[in-house]
């Protein structure tokens, strides 16, 4: 299995001029990133690599279909992966123009030509029903204000038999993270309650999809569903 976490770290170091504090935390490639990852999320290098690799594992290495990523953020996690999927048709959507601009810069710097960018709302996706073979969502649902619409829309645009995969914060798995979410992330507007627990997420996805796997890496809920 390809260690996609290592690919992401290498890309971050090569394109450091585009990166920001968020990228450093995700990749653990900066001192502040390692400190925050350890203190807030309780992650060491091994656990950080695990949630990234687990969340991306459902994407076949030779994937050649249509993939939607929502939200794309800065693209620090996914652009190194998309670079290897040159036969795929990839669409990246984000509500934040600033975040998406960073992702576009990263794609251009890496000469990724099969990715298009769309500014939009996950609660009202501008795509036809059953448009994508894979819908990928990394660290988005804990921030989405209308989570019910987000679940409904990501399901709607996914083809029958398609894959819905990714990860996001779930409550009651790691007390220290829960404390920081309540006292820092929510007040600052980074995260928006209510939050899923591992059990509630598993129950929800099992009702929606033909098959659903949910597990946790500390406070990261990682999921893979088949429609």
Which role fits each region the language model picked out?
Residues 148-160:
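A short glycine-rich, Lys/Arg-flanked "PGG" loop and its adjoining helix->strand segment in the class I
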Residues 134-146:
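A short SAM/SAH-binding and catalytic strip from SAM-dependent methyltransferases
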Residues 42-64:
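Conserved alpha-helix/loop element of class I SAM-dependent methyltransferases that forms part
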Residues 16, 25, 39, 45, ...:
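C-terminal alpha-helical "lid/dimerization" subdomain adjacent to the S-adenosyl-L-methionine
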Residues 123-134:
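A short acidic, Gly/Pro-enriched loop at the edge of an enzyme's catalytic core
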Residues 66, 161-163:
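Short glycine-centered segments of the SAM/dcSAM-binding site in methyltransferase folds
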Residues 1-35:
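N-terminal, positively charged/glycine-rich alpha-helical extensions of SAM-dependent methyltransferases
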Residues 66-124:
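Class I SAM-dependent methyltransferase SAM/SAH-binding core
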């Amino acid at each position: 299995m390809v260690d996609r976490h290592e690919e992401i770290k290498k890309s971050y170091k090569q394109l450091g001029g585009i990166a920001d504090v968020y990228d450093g935390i995700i990749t653990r490639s900066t001192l502040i990133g390692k400190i925050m990852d350890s203190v807030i999320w309780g992650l060491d290098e091994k656990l950080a690599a695990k949630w990234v690799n687990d969340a991306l594992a459902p994407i076949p290495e030779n994937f050649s279909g249509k993939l939607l990523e929502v939200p794309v953020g800065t693209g620090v996690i996914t652009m190194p992966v998309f670079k290897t999927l040159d036969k795929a048709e990839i669409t990246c959507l984000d509500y934040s123009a600033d975040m998406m601009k960073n992702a576009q810069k990263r794609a251009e710097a890496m000469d990724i030509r099969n990715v298009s960018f769309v500014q939009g709302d996950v609660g009202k996706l501008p795509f036809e029903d059953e448009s994508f073979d894979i819908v990928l969502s990394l660290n988005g649902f804990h921030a989405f204000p209308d989570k019910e619409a987000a679940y409904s829309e990501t399901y709607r645009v996914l083809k029958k038999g398609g894959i819905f995969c990714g990860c996001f914060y779930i409550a009651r798995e790691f007390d220290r993270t829960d404390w920081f979410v309540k006292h820092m992330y929510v007040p600052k507007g980074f995260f928006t309650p209510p939050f899923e627990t591992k059990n509630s997420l598993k129950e929800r996805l099992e009702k929606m999809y033909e098959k659903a796997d949910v597990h946790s890496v500390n406070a990261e809920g990682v999921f893979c569903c088949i429609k």
